[in-house]
Every structure is written in structure tokens, then in C-alpha cells.
Regions:
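Buried, small/hydrophobic-residue-enriched core segments of structured protein domains
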Residues: 2, 6-191, 201-211, 225, ...
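Gly/Ser/Thr/Ala-enriched C-terminal appendages of enzymes
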Residues: 183-188, 193, 201-272
Length: 272
């Protein structure tokens, strides 16, 4: 088997994998190769588009709950990191593939406590070195951010280093809210606090938010990434390109079709 290195840029009609084998063995692996290569190339491509739109900001893969089954969620997380994501919320993918596991708490964490401040305070005690607080459970500007600022202030007063901290928003007008949130955090003395966002993001929405001047610097992308929602199938094919003759030379083979896009490129290909 010959293949391009994972993460390589590949163009249409360019071969990704070459299999040299007896015909029966080559046929036996066809379905497995197509299943693996098509799905993970699809997700890696979508991830690359999202990361490009983020213009250097960190992108986290958040899609397991919306993936088409546990395998696609786990292997999709792997592909997303190959495509440029800095980590995944999928802890199984982290265990299997030794990739960074990232994320925040859920709204249910907040709702399980008597009040939002208590929930934030407890989370900060558990994760002082990665304290990202989800601020939109009740009201982002009137409740979430003021309570987050109180927690960050208490941490600073207690001498706890604020190495990686900030907030996440999962709803609302993200451009408007992020600007307000940035001003509130800066005014409170936390200019290096991270502003993270999620909520059905994709490359188009991230680009739009950038153009609107959003102050978001970290993106959690789930459904639209792990399903490649706008283009959910990758059209890779596995075709016979050459047959080895008795004298050791390769005889080119071509698949013809009335549909020009289904005509294959014949001949033994060289992989670099």
C-alpha cells in the first residue's frame, strides 16, 4: 500500500492511496479503504475550512453528540484534529488516539447547583488551570459575566494563577455579546480572559462573526463539523488502474463512461 501522508493537501482526481496486490486481495480491501478514507477525508476537509475561517484562533471539535454513531464521532474527532482542530471533547478519541481533550462544563452543571455563582466557584476549584465558564444558562450579561468576574476575582485574591481562564457562550447574538463581554472583562481587570463560543458554528458563520468584529478567540464547532452538514459525502472511488503482465510491465486500464467525471486516469501512479 502506498499513500500520501495524512494531512496532505489533495486536489480533485489526485490519487490518495495505491494498492498493489493480487486482484482478489485488492478487491477484499476495497470497501474498508473507501469507508475509512472517504469519511475521514471529508471531516478533515471540513475541519480545515473551519480552521482557515478562524484565522489562527483555536478550534475545538465538539460534535460527538450529533455524529452519525459512535464510530463516526470517534474517528471523525481524529480526522478533525488532522484537519487543524487543536483538540476534541471526545474523551474516547483522546484515549485511543492520544490527542488533546478539551471542553467546558454543561448547562446542567449550572442548573444542578442552588445558583450560578456557586456552580462557577465549584468548577473553578476543580479546574483552576483551565477555568472556562459557560455564561449563558440564565442571562449572559446580567448574570453569567458578573458571576464569572466574581469567581476570577476570588481566584486572583487567593493567589491562584490565572493560567488559562475565560468564558464560553452557546447562544444569542454572538457578535454583539462578545463585544459587550470583552468590555466587561477588560474593565474588571481580566484582559487576557478567553472568550469562547459555540452554537451551530461553521466556517461561514465564523467568517461572518469575524467581519462583524466579534471578540471571540476560541471556537467550539460540533454538528456542522462532525457531519460535514453542507456536503455530507466524499466522492472518493477505488478503481483498477493497471494490470501487471507476465514480463513485469504494467498494462494501463481505464474505466470509460458517458459521464465524464466517471472516466478514470489509467496507469500505474507514482507516490512521492
Amino acid at each position: 500500500i502506498y499513500a500520501v501522508p495524512e494531512g496532505s493537501l489533495i486536489f480533485p482526481r489526485e490519487p490518495l492511496v495505491k494498492v498493489v496486490a493480487p486482484i482478489m486481495e485488492a478487491q477484499l480491501v476495497e470497501t474498508a479503504i473507501l469507508n475509512i478514507v472517504n469519511h475521514q477525508s471529508l471531516i478533515a476537509t471540513k475541519a480545515a475550512r473551519v480552521c482557515y475561517a478562524a484565522q489562527g484562533d483555536g478550534v475545538m471539535e465538539f460534535g460527538l453528540r450529533r455524529a452519525q454513531g459512535p464510530d463516526s464521532g470517534t474517528y471523525g474527532a481524529r480526522a478533525a484534529i488532522i484537519g487543524g482542530c487543536k483538540g476534541t471533547s471526545n474523551v474516547l478519541a483522546g484515549q485511543i488516539f492520544h490527542v488533546p481533550v478539551l471542553g467546558t462544563h454543561a448547562h446542567s452543571w449550572i442548573m444542578s447547583f442552588p445558583d450560578e455563582y456557586t456552580a462557577f466557584k465549584k468548577y473553578a476549584e476543580l479546574y483552576p488551570n483551565a477555568c472556562i465558564l459557560l455564561v449563558d444558562t440564565y442571562d449572559t450579561l446580567k448574570s453569567g459575566i458578573p458571576n464569572a468576574i466574581k469567581v476570577f476575582t476570588k481566584m486572583r485574591e487567593a493567589g491562584i494563577p490565572l493560567t488559562y481562564y475565560g468564558i464560553r457562550m452557546d447562544s444569542g447574538d454572538l457578535a454583539y455579546l462578545s463585544k459587550k463581554v470583552r468590555k466587561m472583562l477588560d474593565a474588571a481587570g481580566f484582559p487576557d480572559a478567553v472568550i469562547s463560543a459555540s452554537n451551530d458554528l461553521d466556517e461561514y458563520l465564523i467568517e461572518s462573526l469575524k467581519l462583524q468584529g466579534a471578540t471571540i478567540t476560541s471556537w467550539g464547532v460540533g454538528t456542522n463539523l462532525i457531519t460535514s452538514k453542507d456536503n455530507p459525502a466524499f466522492g472518493g472511488v477505488y478503481k483498477l488502474a493497471a494490470v501487471k503482465a507476465a514480463d513485469g510491465t504494467f498494462i494501463p486500464k481505464i474505466k470509460l463512461s458517458e459521464n465524464i467525471e466517471k472516466v478514470t486516469n489509467p496507469g500505474n501512479k507514482t507516490f512521492y
